[in-house]
Amino acid sequence: MPSNSIFGGAAQAAPPSEALPVICLAGPTGSGKTAAALAVAEALGGEVINADSRQVYADFPRITAQPSAEELACCPHHLYGFLPTAQKISAGRWAAQAQATARQILSRGKIPLLVGGTGLYFQTLLHGTAEIPPVDPALTAAFTARLEDVGSQAMHAELARVDPDYATRIHPNDRQRIVRALEVHAATGKPFTWWHKHAMSRPPCNGPLLVLDAPLPWLEPRLARRLDMMLESGAMDEAAAALKNCDDDDAPGWTGIGCAEALAFLRGRLGFDACRDLWLRNTRAYAKRQLTWFRARPEAVWLPPDNVDAVVKAAGVRLPAGV
């Protein structure tokens, strides 16, 4: 592994008050981020930090497509599979952990490489987080109870009336984010998106946002093959084991794509073929939303998904000051 000195000296941690220099590698699900990340880490002397909100869960390494044991052995990886299914993690809490991890990596003379597909994580990391006042837990409980009563579709429609911009960014079944946006609007009188535009904290990190440009026609057959490989290699057994650890359908870990469909199969709400079809449709829709989100980021640097050399080169010439 080459020394970082060819890129301006050994990586050094920034003072606590300064944004930490990092490289961000993003893209839609199934676009080949893991392979590209390993190539960048090997070429530049990096360590990988997970930036995918589903890959934080310990019970679902296969279903959430976490790096394999062989891939994990190629270089140090951080923030993968550390959270129980019953727990949730906010973007702000993740960013704090990612920042602390990046600081440790820099202190070792290595480059922090953030890898994933969760746009909100990258937004929080590179642009800060909205400093929203605390919401009364009773208000949260009231909206949660109402969601149970009328369903997520109706609540999503309500969100579309008070915060149409945010409603277009989240899935109508994303119960946690729907409740969060509605409670913030009710508590503050301002839409969730207003807070993210006008009350942002200091960004914890700084660096390029490299995005794999994987169009849907290219992605679709890859997503289908990956799903079939997951199912053939024991995805349902993994879900069944997770159910023994957390028998709560509303637990945060069960809300992700793949986890929710597998749970529906295990509960007898879907047959196997219907489960696979829904899983694939939802994965495709998610990839489309990811592409839409990243295309709206003016700082994104788009790169071919099937050319890791191009990704390595782009990362090398865009290293932020301090690494």
Swiss-Prot record:
Cross-referenced InterPro entries: Dimethylallyltransferase (IPR039657), IPT (IPR018022), P-loop_NTPase (IPR027417)
GO molecular function, one term: ATP binding
A Pfam family recorded for this sequence: IPPT
Residues given in the record as substrate binding sites: 29-34
Organism domain of life: Bacteria
Protein name as it appears in the record: tRNA dimethylallyltransferase
Cofactor(s) demanded: Mg(2+)
SUBUNIT field: Monomer.
Gene that encodes it: miaA
Gene3D superfamilies named among the record's database cross-references: 1.10.20.140, P-loop containing nucleotide triphosphate hydrolases
Family: Belongs to the IPP transferase family.
Catalytic activity, EC: 2.5.1.75
GO biological process, one term: tRNA modification
Chain intervals for the UniProt region annotation (Interaction with substrate tRNA): 52-55, 176-180
Reaction(s) catalysed (UniProt annotation): adenosine(37) in tRNA + dimethylallyl diphosphate = N(6)-dimethylallyladenosine(37) in tRNA + diphosphate
Function: Catalyzes the transfer of a dimethylallyl group onto the adenine at position 37 in tRNAs that read codons beginning with uridine, leading to the formation of N6-(dimethylallyl)adenosine (i(6)A).
Class of the enzyme per the UniProt entry, highest EC level: transferase
Entry keyword set: ATP-binding, Magnesium, Nucleotide-binding, Transferase, tRNA processing
Site (Interaction with substrate tRNA): 118
